[in-house]
A protein has these predicted regions:
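Extracellular parallel beta-helix/beta-solenoid repeat domains
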Residues: 1-233
Length: 233
């Protein structure tokens, strides 16, 4: 995305340009590059990048499970493809405890899918609790020279395990954290443990005045329900 303007039409006297996120990327691969864009008047995050954790609801045989999209605003698309690498995720701790390769995918309904793997389902898997994350469909992200203003939520929400660069941007009075790094498996089910993020040369003006984790301008906030100091996520 180069020089894209997400904002009310000039002269329209409107304050809002979107009722939710403006640029929302879910389950992508490759590289997402957003350069010299302008965001104003979003009612949710101007930029949101993440994967999706699907809950394991049934074990069909030693290699096959039934998975379910859990959030009512995120379902009905192809989340897995033959040959993809996946991780089994403990929902309470957000830890990846096993991996496998997808052998076949069968869509059952808009909310459920049957997936077969190249190895046995982990014995420690907890049905109706743990999730499966697609590791293959995770993008690199580069956001540069952008301007974020007049949003009641975050400026940039980032959840991907691949390299992320957020540089030379201006965040002006975002209501919550200007940059939020977060993942969960029991709420929005937005997946992707973050491993490599560079945030540099950005300008933050009056951000996080109305909320966000501890009103932090840059917030790292994994939503794991169980916290273990010996095994941080």
């Amino acid at each position: 995305m180069d020089r894209v303007k997400c904002m009310p039409r000039e002269g329209s006297d409107r304050l809002l340009a979107a009722s939710a996120d403006m640029m929302h990327y879910s389950g992508c691969s490759g590289k997402i590059r957003i350069d010299s864009c302008y965001f104003a008047g979003a009612q949710d995050d101007p930029i949101n990048v993440h994967g999706t954790n699907l809950r394991v609801v049934e074990k069909l045989d030693e290699h096959t499970v039934k998975l379910r999209f859990m959030h009512g605003q995120s379902y009905g698309y192809n989340a897995y493809f033959e040959g993809d690498t996946v991780a089994f995720v403990r929902a309470s701790t957000m830890e990846r405890f096993a991996s496998a390769c997808v052998v076949s995918v069968k869509r059952l309904t808009d909310r459920t899918v049957e997936v077969a793997f190249d190895r046995d389902i982990p014995k420690e898997l907890e049905l109706n609790h743990d999730c499966v994350e697609n590791i293959s469909c995770t993008p690199e992200v580069e956001i540069r020279n952008c301007y974020f203003t007049r949003t009641s939520t975050r400026g940039t929400l980032m959840t991907t395990p691949r390299k992320v660069v957020i540089a030379d941007n201006t965040y002006y009075k975002t209501g919550m954290s200007a940059i939020l790094i977060e993942g969960d498996a029991e709420g929005w089910y937005e997946s992707g443990p973050v491993n490599d993020v560079l945030i540099q040369n950005n300008i933050f003006i009056g951000c996080a005045y109305s909320g966000g984790p501890e009103n932090a301008v840059i917030a790292l906030h994994p939503s794991n329900m169980v916290v273990d100091a010996e095994r941080p996520v």
